[in-house]
UniProtKB/Swiss-Prot annotation:
<comment type="pathway">
    <text>Amino-acid biosynthesis; L-arginine biosynthesis; N(2)-acetyl-L-ornithine from L-glutamate: step 2/4.</text>
</comment>
<dbReference type="GO" id="GO:0005737">
    <property type="term" value="C:cytoplasm"/>
</dbReference>
<dbReference type="GO" id="GO:0042450">
    <property type="term" value="P:arginine biosynthetic process via ornithine"/>
</dbReference>
<feature type="site" description="Transition state stabilizer">
    <location>
        <position position="14"/>
    </location>
</feature>
<dbReference type="Pfam" id="PF00696">
    <property type="entry name" value="AA_kinase"/>
</dbReference>
<dbReference type="InterPro" id="IPR036393">
    <property type="entry name" value="AceGlu_kinase-like_sf"/>
</dbReference>
<keyword id="KW-0028">Amino-acid biosynthesis</keyword>
<keyword id="KW-0067">ATP-binding</keyword>
<keyword id="KW-0418">Kinase</keyword>
<feature type="binding site">
    <location>
        <position position="68"/>
    </location>
    <ligand>
        <name>substrate</name>
    </ligand>
</feature>
<dbReference type="GO" id="GO:0005524">
    <property type="term" value="F:ATP binding"/>
</dbReference>
<dbReference type="InterPro" id="IPR001057">
    <property type="entry name" value="Glu/AcGlu_kinase"/>
</dbReference>
<keyword id="KW-0055">Arginine biosynthesis</keyword>
<keyword id="KW-0963">Cytoplasm</keyword>
<dbReference type="InterPro" id="IPR037528">
    <property type="entry name" value="ArgB"/>
</dbReference>
<dbReference type="GO" id="GO:0006526">
    <property type="term" value="P:L-arginine biosynthetic process"/>
</dbReference>
<protein>
    <recommendedName>
        <fullName>Acetylglutamate kinase</fullName>
        <ecNumber>2.7.2.8</ecNumber>
    </recommendedName>
</protein>
Length: 272
């Protein structure tokens, strides 16, 4: 990955749910990125762990357009698992590799402020504002931020409503990358690349083409928030990519060699 002299060297990385798997190499790649002088900012999800604990507690998992309906009881599980268990497992793994890391959530220092999307999906929300003060302070102290997408419910909050929100980690990653004007936004997923209308893998797409994939319905499911977040980041001057995190060392390969999945830029389309 080439850095310009004006680069802030910030790379925002959205970690998929496999990062705690002993065979996953993504966290090991973080150590290499630090050695290369980059400043990784990690955002994680943990939907499968939330679902597993919900089942243990006898709570039904309900999804609308692939996102979790978040009632009071589910919000408790989301906050405990994402801002607690999953976040601290990742931080502990990084510390074990000699990387100074700190786990925070969107609530801390009002890093992510949001509002409820719709009454029928409960405390499922959308990002309204990003405050980068805490993230920047950690980076300046050479500490890697590990961010849970549990966020602060302040905007248009009804009287008596909860102060926490469950926000999808994909848009959180895009908004943070945009606010930080990061050099790169990387999504580690369980697919090799974004697919075109004929099912072909797309190696590089322009922002306009990404928007067409969304508007036409070619992009579906979990790819929708990822592509939207890539568009958000490119508008702020970042480049963005979606790569297969299941393959060993794909993160470091993408950032040093490139061409590992789908890159969203303002340039011409290249198919792989």
């Amino acid at each position: 990955m080439e850095m310009t002299q004006s680069s802030n060297h910030i790379v925002v990385i959205k970690l998929g749910g496999s990062v705690l798997d002993s065979k996953d190499t993504s966290l090991k790649d973080i150590a290499t990125l630090k050695q290369l002088g980059l400043k990784p900012v990690l955002i994680h999800g943990g939907a499968s762990t939330v679902s597993a604990w919900s089942a243990k507690l006898g709570l039904e998992t309900r999804l609308v357009n692939g996102e979790r309906v978040t009632d009071d009881a589910t919000l408790d599980v989301v906050a405990a698992i994402l801002a607690g268990l999953v976040n601290k497992e990742i931080v502990a793994a990084l510390l074990d590799m000699g990387i100074k890391a700190a786990g925070i959530s969107g609530v801390d220092s009002a890093t992510i402020t949001g509002q409820i999307r719709a009454t029928e999906t409960g405390y499922l929300g959308d990002v309204v504002q990003v405050n980068t003060e805490l993230i920047t302070a950690l980076l300046d102290a050479n500490i890697t931020p590990v961010i849970s997408p549990v966020s602060f419910h302040q905007i248009n909050r009804p009287s008596g409503s909860r102060r926490l929100l469950n926000i999808n980690g994909d848009p959180v990653a895009g908004e943070i990358a945009s606010a930080l004007q990061a050099e790169r936004l990387v999504f580690l997923t369980d697919v090799p690349a974004v697919k075109g209308k004929n099912g072909e893998a797309l190696g590089e797409i322009s922002a306009d083409h990404a928007a067409e994939l969304l508007a036409s319905g070619t992009a579906s499911g979990g790819m929708i928030p990822k592509l939207r977040s890539c568009l958000k980041a490119t508008l702020a001057g970042s480049s963005a990519c979606i790569i297969d995190g299941r393959k060993p060392h794909m993160l470091i390969r993408e950032l040093t060699e490139g061409n590992c999945g789908t890159t969203v830029t303002g340039q011409h389309l290249r198919r792989s």
